[in-house]
Amino acid sequence: MDKDLKKVVVLLAPPNMKNSKANKALFDAIKEMDDVAIFNLYEMPDENILNMDAWSRIISHANAVIYQFPFYWMSAPSLLKKWQDEIFTYLAKTPAVAGKPLLVATTTGSEFDAYRSGGRNRFTVDELLRPYQCGAVHAGMIWQTPFVVYGMGTCLLYTSDAADER
């Protein structure tokens, strides 16, 4: 994992990346960028996911941290939550994360209008992400406005093959 000492650390956490269109597109947009290290938690060996020493070095070296995940039941998938509980909880008490930006990049199945007062989900995504913001602030990080892609469960995604058939 130390070979990935980069300036931006992306914790990628879609449980089913193979079938993900939106998270795969976000991944494809950044995977070749210099100084970006992407760690797909669902493809890492178990012993690396919770390796405190390795994560401490990686995060200490980074200038920014990004959590990228599909929004599952108003939260992150379980493996990112486990990483937060076991790694971030420790790092939050050290200088490793202090002063660094934390960005959440997430995709939702529901459309934008579902995430508002009176909408199907009753709250905005910003409101639902408040625990992440609270954790960042508590750790001395700089909370960034979340990057949210809405409506992945409700939109039609066209491929070049589909366009050729029309």
Question: What residues fall within each predicted segment?
Answer:
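Helix-loop-strand module that forms the ligand-binding subsite of alpha/beta enzymes
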Residues: 53-133, 139
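N-terminal beta1-alpha1 ligand-phosphate binding loop
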Residues: 2-34
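Cofactor-binding loop segments of dinucleotide-utilizing enzymes, especially the Rossmann-like FAD-
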Residues: 13, 41, 107
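Conserved small/polar residues in nucleotide/adenosyl-binding loops
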Residues: 158-166
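Active-site rim beta-loop-alpha module in soluble metabolic enzymes
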Residues: 148-154
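Structural motif
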Residues: 46-53, 156-157
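A short beta-strand-loop structural module common to alpha/beta enzyme folds
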Residues: 35-47
